[in-house]
Swiss-Prot record:
Region (Disordered): 201-223
The name this protein goes by in its record: UPF0441 protein YgiB
Record-stated family: Belongs to the UPF0441 family.
UniProt biased composition (Polar residues): 204-223
NCBIfam families, per the entry: PRK11653.1 (NF008655)
InterPro entries from the UniProt entry: Biofilm_formation_YgiB
Length: 223
């Protein structure tokens, strides 16, 4: 009986300790989660070209040129592609489209379809690029091409957007902003052509999701 009593007392002590330590454990977990969130964000700079970057970063001209050229290559690989020039212009505006290199991520059957309709496929010009530190703390820089529409009817009008349609605010180079580290991750190559207005729809959906997420965050902070 004494032994049984001892076991019950031990169980009681463990139960009491668990109940009283749980809030502390939760608090510690919350701190680590917050720390993780802080580390998941990154400050990036937005530039129109290598000259803008060099002017803002004296002594970093070589790095700026490398980042700009890498962004151009990434734009060729990931930008929305259109079967005709007219489809691209309808989305991004006159003077904002160019013929895309035939090897820029398109599957052979899609290349054939595009070339049959217009001799090539089309993509928007890179309007600017984001530049930030490499993920993992490397010494180099990461970059992400940005696109912008000059067609007032497009959801991307006057805004910087990435290849996935995510909106990064006004198409105004020379500013800095905080973005999730995932924003700088390479985007998948474009392997199919986009229908007219399709990219604008992606931008509209992404913007709605961003507003919804921001509203949820504000309500959570406000209790």
């Amino acid at each position: 009986m004494k032994r049984t009593k001892s076991i019950h007392h031990a169980s009681f002590r463990k139960s009491w300790s668990a109940r009283h330590l749980t809030p502390v454990a939760l608090a510690v977990t919350a701190v680590f989660m917050l720390a993780g969130c802080e580390k998941s964000d990154e400050t990036v700079s937005l530039y129109q070209n290598a000259d803008d970057c060099s002017a803002a970063n004296p002594g970093k001209s070589a790095e700026c040129t490398t980042a700009y050229n890498n962004a151009l290559k990434e734009a060729e690989r990931t930008a929305p592609k259109y079967a005709t020039r007219e489809d691209c212009v309808a989305e991004f505006g006159e003077g904002q489209c160019q013929q895309a290199p035939a090897q820029a991520g398109m599957a052979p059957e899609n290349q054939a379809q595009a070339q049959q309709s217009s001799g090539s496929f089309w993509m928007p010009l890179m309007a600017g690029y984001m530049m930030g530190r490499l993920m993992g703390g490397g010494a180099g820089f990461a970059q992400q091409p940005l696109f912008s529409s000059k067609n007032p009817a497009s959801p991307a009008y006057g805004k910087y957007t990435d290849a996935a349609g995510k909106n990064y605010g006004a198409a105004q180079p020379g500013r800095t902003m905080t973005v999730p580290k995932t924003a700088m991750a390479p985007k998948p190559a474009t392997t199919t052509t986009v229908t007219r207005g399709g990219f604008g729809e992606s931008v509209a959906k992404q913007s709605a999701m961003q507003r919804s997420a921001a509203g949820t965050s504000t309500r959570s902070m406000g209790g």
